[in-house]
């Protein structure tokens, strides 16, 4: 199975990818880690990889027989949607995402949740901006996912996500 999970910041992509990976044994890849390399010396806590390195890492993942990818739907990873057997768009409510953004930011600042960036006020502001860009369609995530309607499943709520995980469990049984 080649699964691509896409959605805005704090929609639950990473959590769902890990859960699917645990249920199926298929490795999951967080594409933020393909774009960014952790670097504690940098003010942001990471740096952007050169495009050539990013693309090399991404194509190595796509060459695998199976994978679970998760990302915000960046244009540079559109090929991942093309190769996927199934695409999941997490279209959770803005209120839920904003709550998760704040909760995550607090947990990261108290070192209760790991992160590959510095959880400062700039990052908090950016997360709210990215969430809003999804809501308005400015980021193009929904539009890109809808290009693949024949293999797209849109999940809107934690209940729908739970039902999706149950269906994956039953497929594995």
Predicted segments, located by residue:
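Hydrophobic anchor at the beta1->P-loop junction of P-loop NTPases
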Residues: 5
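The conserved Walker
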Residues: 9
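Conserved lysine of the Walker
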Residues: 13
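Conserved substrate/cofactor phosphate-moiety recognition/catalytic segment
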Residues: 18, 22-65
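Short, structured coil segments at secondary-structure junctions
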Residues: 24, 83-84, 148-149
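Glycine-rich phosphate-binding loop used to anchor ATP phosphates in small-molecule kinases
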Residues: 51-96
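A glycine- and Lys/Arg-enriched "phosphate-lid" helix/loop adjacent to the NTP-binding pocket
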Residues: 92-137
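NTP-dependent small-molecule kinase module
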Residues: 132-173
